[in-house]
Curated annotation (Swiss-Prot):
Compartments (UniProt record): Cytoplasm
GO biological process: CMP-keto-3-deoxy-D-manno-octulosonic acid biosynthetic process; lipopolysaccharide biosynthetic process
Protein name stated in the entry: 3-deoxy-manno-octulosonate cytidylyltransferase
Function: Activates KDO (a required 8-carbon sugar) for incorporation into bacterial lipopolysaccharide in Gram-negative bacteria.
Primary gene name: kdsB
Annotated source species: Vibrio cholerae serotype O1 (strain ATCC 39315 / El Tor Inaba N16961)
Alphabetically ordered keywords of this record: Cytoplasm, Lipopolysaccharide biosynthesis, Nucleotidyltransferase, Transferase
GO molecular function, one term: 3-deoxy-manno-octulosonate cytidylyltransferase activity
A Pfam family that the UniProt record links to this protein: CTP_transf_3
C-alpha cells in the first residue's frame, strides 16, 4: 500500500515565531517531523511551506518541498494545492502530519494510512483513550464517538458521551473510556477538493471543528484508537524546551 505524507510548515507562529526551524538536538524541527514520516514507510514525504527560509532548510537536508500560497484560509486549502502541484492521483492516500510534532510515532502515521486503505470512507483519523480526568471536561480536548464499525458519529468539545448516572455524582467518576481525537488525517486525494467545495456547516462553525463538515454532508470518517499515544506538539517556547530535554535524554 502506497501513500504520501504532506507536512505543512508555516514560518509565522504567534507564540513561537520561526517554529519549523527551531533547533532540536542540532536539527530543525521540520527535519525531525520529516524523518519520522519517512520511517513510517511513505512513498513520498512533502513539506508544504510559503516561506523561503523553510524551503532552504528543507533542501539543505535533502527533503522534498512544495511552495504554496501564503493566502490559504485553512490547512486543507494548502493540502489541495500540494495535491494539484505534485500531480497526486485522486485515488492515492495522503496523510497530513502537523509540522510541529517532532516526536510523532511513525507507527501511527502508517496506521492511519492503512486504516483508510482498508475501509470505504474518504477520510480516516485516530484517537486515544482519555486517561486524565481533567481532559474529559476540557473543551480544548476534542472528544469523538463512533459507531460499532469505527466510523465517527460526532466530534465535540463537549463531554461525549455524557454519562448521566455517574456524572450526576459529586466526584463525576469516569467509569468508561472516552476518546480524545488527535489531529492526524488520511485522505483519498480526490476527496480534498470535494471537501473544499462544500460550504462550512453550522455545526462546524459552532464547535470550530472542520471535520464536522464531512459528517454534515453525509460522508464518513474512520476512527481508530492509535497504536501509540503521540507526545504533545510544540506550540510554545515551553513546549520546545520539553522536546529538547526528551531528545537530549534519548541521546545519552
Amino acid at each position: 500500500m502506497s501513500f504520501t505524507v504532506v507536512i505543512p510548515a508555516r514560518y509565522q507562529s504567534t507564540r513561537l515565531p520561526g517554529k519549523p526551524l527551531a533547533d532540536i538536538g542540532g536539527k530543525p524541527m521540520i527535519q525531525w517531523v520529516y524523518e519520522q514520516a519517512m520511517q513510517a514507510g511513505a512513498d513520498r514525504v512533502i513539506i508544504a511551506t510559503d516561506d523561503e527560509r523553510v524551503e532552504q532548510a528543507v533542501q539543505a537536508f535533502g527533503g522534498v518541498v512544495c511552495m504554496t500560497s501564503p493566502n490559504h484560509q485553512s490547512g486543507t486549502e494548502r493540502l489541495a494545492e500540494v495535491v494539484a502541484k505534485m500531480a497526486i492521483p485522486a485515488d492515492h492516500i495522503v496523510v497530513n502530519v502537523q509540522g510541529d510534532e517532532p516526536l510523532i510515532p511513525p507507527a501511527i502515521i502508517r496506521q492511519v494510512a492503512d486504516n483508510l486503505a482498508a475501509c470505504s470512507a474518504p477520510m480516516a483519523t485516530l484517537a486515544v483513550e482519555i486517561e486524565d480526568e481533567a481532559e474529559v471536561f476540557n473543551p480544548n480536548a476534542v472528544k469523538v464517538i463512533t459507531d460499532k464499525s469505527g466510523y465517527a458519529l460526532y466530534f465535540s468539545r463537549a463531554t461525549i458521551p455524557w454519562d448521566r448516572d455517574n456524572f450526576a455524582k459529586a466526584d463525576k467518576a469516569i467509569v468508561q473510556p472516552l476518546l480524545r481525537h488527535i489531529g492526524i488525517y488520511a485522505y483519498r486525494a480526490g476527496f480534498i477538493n470535494t471537501y473544499l467545495d462544500w460550504q462550512p456547516s453550522q455545526l462546524e462553525k459552532i464547535e470550530c471543528l472542520e471535520q464536522l463538515r464531512v459528517l454534515w454532508h453525509g460522508e464518513k470518517i474512520h476512527v481508530a484508537v492509535a497504536l501509540e499515544a503521540p507526545p504533545a506538539g510544540v506550540d510554545t517556547p515551553e513546549d520546545l524546551e520539553v522536546v529538547r530535554r526528551i531528545v537530549a535524554e534519548r541521546a545519552q
